[in-house]
Amino acid sequence: MKAAPHGDRFLWIADEEGRRNIWVAEKTGSAWAVHRVTNDDADDGIEIGDISWTPDGQQIVYVRGGDFEFPERPSPNPDLLPQGVEQDIYIVSAHGGDTRKLAAGREPEVSPDGGTVAYIDDDQIWTLDLRDAAAKPAQLFHGRGRPDSLTWSPDGKYLAFASGRGDHGFIGVFSFANQTLSYVDPSTEIDREPVWSPDSRHIAFVRIPPDTSGVSFKPRRSAPPWSIRIADVTTGEGHEIWRAHDGPGSVFHGTESEQQLYWTAGDHIVFPWEGTGWLHLYTVSTSGGTATDLTPGDFEVDYVAFSGDRRTLVYSSNQDDIDRRHLWQVAADGGAPHELTHGDGLEVIPVLAPDGTLAVLRADAHWPLRPAIVESDGQMRDMTPQMMPKDFPADKLVTPKQVIFSAADGMQIHGQLFLPAGDADGKHPAVVFFHGGSRRQMLLGFHYMEYYSNAYAMNEYLTSLGYVVLSVNYRSGIGYGLDFREALNYGAAGASEFNDVEGAGLYLRSRSDVDGAHIGVWGGSYGGYLTALALARASDLFAAGVDLHGVHDWNLELQNWGPYNPNADPNAARIAWESSPLASVKTWKSPVLLIQGDDDRNVQFSNTVRLAAALRAQGTPFEEHVFPDEIHDFLLHRDWITAYTLGSEFFNRYLKGVPASQ
């Protein structure tokens, strides 16, 4: 969701059963008029993203096609379109109408005067003159590395970007007046997150020492500290204005927002830091000195909006309501924050218009994510009530309850418990859900990420079928502080999350309303990993499972996330193997349904191939469903429907004894 540069207008992308389109809301009097800008009417698996307004607010630039998580990979084509799918940049009037293709590429950024768009294609930066419909793309320069974070200077004379070089990275600056490229303050570390000073003379950026261990999915509570630097654009000289302490917060961890640094009107830099063990916003003078915590307390900041006058920050956090999100506001240069919203809903992604109008993407236990206006009294007014399907069963959904249970090792774990409505007596089959990530937190309502909004809907559906459902926020997830996220021995370093898996099953078994002999487990990605681990190590506790694109061999999966050689550290490779479901496959007895797309870029499809082969060899009952050319986060709406239909039918057969035909 983004605000127009002028007036009260906001845009966002809506996905209606696979039909992805851009919508605009504009204030007319005291009401909001909403219209669709683009007209894609097919569930074709083609995503749109990288949306932005032109500076005059009259047009919208966006990208259609490609993989926005792995932009360097070929465009996925799960709909098996014979012509294939390309990633292209388009422009369209904010009032709707015909779209115009500008060029092949991604990450378009329009210059402050609206005359030029810069973008990335094939790891090079290109520009196109927007004032001339016949103009051809021109490569700005020939550069090494992988560019991203294109950022125009406020005066439009420079373009800054981050240049990833593997184990190091630079901040590049192109001067349009001189037609020269330079890299400011280069080092052997990784420079990223560039932000301009208001006068276009300096750039602030983050400098991060590289992690040379080469192993992902392991705890990392400390490292050589990261820092914030400011460089002079003319000379290229830079200096440090702040450095993290040793220990907690020495590893850089950003918010969910696209931008991490904010240059304020008072010449301060606002930035995220975990110095207290919780992700907060801090401010430090551009001349250096001690940083001030703007958001003190035991909670985490999620998304951040920065006012056009550079004086105010609005952010979402779980302050005073750890399993929800609400909005808070604080002065950019310091002062006490104050609460803007509260209640039983989830107010997650704030957006500020130039005149101070505050919009937010919000959800709750009964309605999924939707745009709303936040009034001065904290009340919220939905912009698009007419967009909700008339047959949406909001009144039939239950409100999950917050529960806290003990893991097998005693750690306290949060979850959301879904209880069948109007059926308090008797014992029910139950299902445990594990989210993916693992850097995620499930909430007491529809999630703000589409993948987990779908999962929340699945949990509600299973509840409507008579299941007690427990969604688990296991260790190594977010929301509960640094030490919880960087849990000791998690993932490939020891699978300590299995304590939470076992604790969840035992918690359900102890409930008087649960049939302890019929507890199932399901999840996707990292949740698929924990589902497989549950079945491999505890088939006596979990009677059946649905595993969507799960990790089954860490030594295979780690190769997907960077250079990894299992032979380089045999002891670490041994622990990674022992932390894998395949290492315990001999004790896997319960039936499982395996689901994955074979163009998965997050979890190698070989994980499922190897697990299926092992289960087949030992006679463990399993079923499978493969989506050819589908990726990790299914792009086709009908693939989600198929996966969840098969999953619910599988549980009905093995946990309720319902024949397949029913």
PLM features: residue spans?
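Serine-hydrolase catalytic core recognition
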Residues: G266, E339, V348-Q662
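Conserved beta-strand position repeated across blades of beta-propeller domains
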Residues: K2-A4, S52, E109, T151, ...
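Hydrophobic beta-strand positions that form the internal "hydrophobic ladder"
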Residues: F10, I60, V117, G156-L159, ...
